[in-house]
Design a protein with these regions (language model features):
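Short amphipathic alpha-helix that is part of the acyltransferase structural core
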Residues: 1-28
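Conserved beta-hairpin
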Residues: 18, 32-47
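Short, conserved, surface-exposed binding loops centered on an aromatic residue
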Residues: 27-28, 37, 56
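Acyl-donor binding region in acyl/amide transferases
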Residues: 8, 32, 50-140
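Charged phosphate-binding loop/patch that engages nucleotide di/tri-phosphates or the phosphate backbone
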Residues: 140-151
Length: 151
């Protein structure tokens, strides 16, 4: 496999890739930054990073990988997780997080220096006081993190 390179993407381009390839999530409405992973001029993955979805984790120093999606090409997930962490660190953030389904191995995260931080029960953001339609899996998830700098 040739070397993986990054390219800038517009939100529309990233969302189109997610809509075509992501196994269980829809595209996002906004993000802080995003990039594409390219091999031989072909887009093989996208990574989108935003403020943490959970307001309890949104401390101003943490970012979340909200979408990482590939076409199945080898090593692209690890490449994207590593690149997202480097970019977040360069921007001055101290921590980056992401969630995976508890049925996923996390091998790409472990390979790129991330560690398990917590396990969630899963569930939906829907509440009687604030109705939401849930399209994502509501199964338990594992939160991984990578410390980028000591505070």
């Amino acid at each position: 496999m040739n070397r993986i390179k990054t390219i800038p993407l517009e939100l529309r381009q990233a969302n189109e890739f997610v809509d075509n390839f992501h196994r269980h999530h829809d595209s996002v409405h906004r993000d802080k930054f995003r990039f594409g992973a390219v091999v031989d001029g072909k887009l093989v993955g996208v990574c989108q990073v935003a403020r943490p979805v959970s307001r309890h984790l949104d401390d101003g120093n943490t970012l979340e990988v909200v979408r990482l999606c590939t076409n199945g090409s080898k090593d692209v997930c690890s490449f994207c997780y590593s690149k997202a962490a480097r970019i977040a660190k360069e921007l001055g953030y101290s921590k980056i997080i992401t969630y995976i389904l508890n049925s996923e191995s996390g091998a790409s995260l472990k390979a790129s220096g991330w560690q398990i931080e917590a396990e969630t029960k899963g569930g939906s953001w829907d509440r009687p006081s604030r109705r939401r339609t849930t399209t994502a899996p509501i199964v338990p998830k594992v939160r991984y993190s990578r410390i980028l700098r000591k505070e």
